[in-house]
A protein has these predicted regions:
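Conserved N-terminal phosphate-binding loop of PLP-dependent enzymes in the Aspartate aminotransferase
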Residues: 2-459
């Protein structure tokens, strides 16, 4: 065991020796330095050598208000002095109460109950467990299954991973929690039917959920988990009418609709909760990342009064909880973050500028490697292809060589931190801080243009 504090110049080596990085091919850094980020300011981050990068992913879809916000840091420090920790297990503390009330006010419909977690995966896990226990309490104990979409990512806990629609991510941990079933997603760029008619495609995609409910048996299905804009695979927005049809189906078969907004909530699409942007009211919302702009970890499941009702009767208890759920410091930062959103009009800023962001990214359509540009708000994916006419994607060797071997490193080297992702077809994912302006969009486009032009020569 090492007891010496690492010298700054040795941080990269020490990281390789001791820091097991998440979702990371560790062998990549055996003979290469680990990128080490030491500070952030506004829309940019800086490494340990002083080099500046545009944060094109808001950390990990998290840093909505930008880096270096003194008011958020001060909110954390003040709360840590006043009450650093107390659980919300049969007790309350002021910041958890206030944040829960603020979220309930922002949520649509009768979603007035807030169950805090420490992150998004825990929020998804909470929603599934709550759905199961709800149906047991209401006399329908056989309703335990869930339906989600192909290629969708919903988290890493055992239940959330079962809901996830990425077989390669799940394979090492099988067998997982049984009862999670998949339907097609809303990738209209590769639609098997109705690719030229978004409304018809949306109806078809929603109807696949009904078909799966009928196939499994409506008396066995508890919930449907959907992101407003699906992240994995490269930002699939919902076709017109999709969520309205899904809501009808869920109501018809007494199935709960869970809007997984871990990424999409808190301004990413220009509204506090993304379901509002697409005009549907779910039974539960899972959220996390942007709630504090990343200045302290927290997550939540926001729940309708109807679902909460049986748990508020007699000796019934939701048999679930987390030590750090609703942590006082995180809750205080969440409140300060919501105050900042209101003060600076961040949601409206996204709505006012999302068209400019899209238009700037769509300039890349003139590159032969760019097949599709899709997304919503400040949340976009750029799908890469070998042939624009046939939409031919990369093969496995090309993905390894071009996406991993070249693009991931070269984009960062050229000053853009974003994500080159192959969880579906190869895409570049972009989600800059919500304080971004045209200057930020132009910087992203210029770096992408130069790097993708070079990548094309390597196919």
């Amino acid at each position: 065991m090492s007891t010496d504090s690492p010298n700054p110049k040795d941080l990269s080596r020490t990281a390789y020796d001791h820091l097991w990085m998440h979702f990371t091919r560790m062998s990549s850094y055996e003979n290469a330095p680990v990128p080490t980020i030491v500070r952030g300011e506004g829309t940019h981050i800086y490494d340990d050598k002083g080099k500046r990068y545009l944060d094109g992913l808001a950390g990990l879809f998290v840093v909505q208000a930008g880096h270096g916000r003194t008011e958020l840091a001060e909110a954390a420090a003040k709360q840590a002095q006043e009450l650093a920790f107390f659980p919300v297990w049969s007790y309350a503390h002021p910041k958890a109460v206030e944040l829960a009330e603020r979220l309930a006010v922002e949520a649509p419909g009768d979603l007035n109950k807030v169950f805090f977690t420490t992150g998004g995966g825990e929020a998804v896990e909470t929603a599934w467990k709550l759905a199961k226990q709800y149906f047991k309490l209401t006399g329908k104990p056989t309703k335990y299954k869930v339906i989600s979409r192909a290629v969708a990512y919903h988290g890493t806990p055992q239940g959330a991973l079962s809901i996830t629609g990425l077989p390669a991510l799940k394979a090492p941990f099988e067998p997982l929690v049984p009862g999670a079933h998949k339907v097609p997603n809303t990738n209209i760029y590769r639609a098997p039917l109705f690719g030229d008619d978004p409304e018809a495609f949306g109806r078809w995609a929603a109807d696949q959920i009904e078909q799966e409910i009928l196939f499994e048996g409506a008396d066995t299905v508890a919930a449907v988990f959907l992101e407003p804009v699906q992240n994995a695979g490269g930002c699939f927005p919902p076709p017109p009418g999709y969520f309205q049809r899904v809501r009808e189906i869920c109501d018809q078969y007494d199935v709960l609709l869970v809007s997984d907004e871990v990424i999409c909530a808190f301004g990413r699409l220009g509204t506090t909760f993304a379901c509002d942007k697409f005009g549907y009211v779910p039974d539960m919302i899972t959220c996390a990342k942007g709630m504090t702009s990343g200045y302290s970890p927290i997550g939540a499941c926001v729940i309708s009064d109807r679902l909460a009702e049986p748990f508020y009767k007699g000796d019934n208890t939701f048999l679930h909880g987390y030590t750090f759920g609703g942590h006082p410091v995180s809750a205080a930062v969440g409140i300060a973050n919501l105050d900042l959103f209101e003060r600076e009009g961040l949601n409206q800023h996204v709505l006012d500028n999302e068209g400019a962001f899209r238009a700037t990214l769509e300039k890349l359509h003139d590159l032969p490697i760019v097949g599709d540009v899709r997304g919503n708000g400040f949340f976009y994916g750029i799908e890469l292809v070998k042939d624009k006419n046939t939409k031919e994607s990369f093969n496995e060797e090309e993905t390894e060589r071009v996406l991993y071997g070249f693009l991931s490193k070269k984009l960062f080297e050229n000053g853009l931190y974003c994500r080159a992702d192959d969880r579906g077809d190869p895409v570049i994912q972009l989600a800059p801080p919500l304080i971004s302006h045209q200057e930020t969009f132009d910087e992203i486009e210029q770096i992408l243009r130069a790097t993708l032009t070079e990548a094309w020569t390597k196919l």
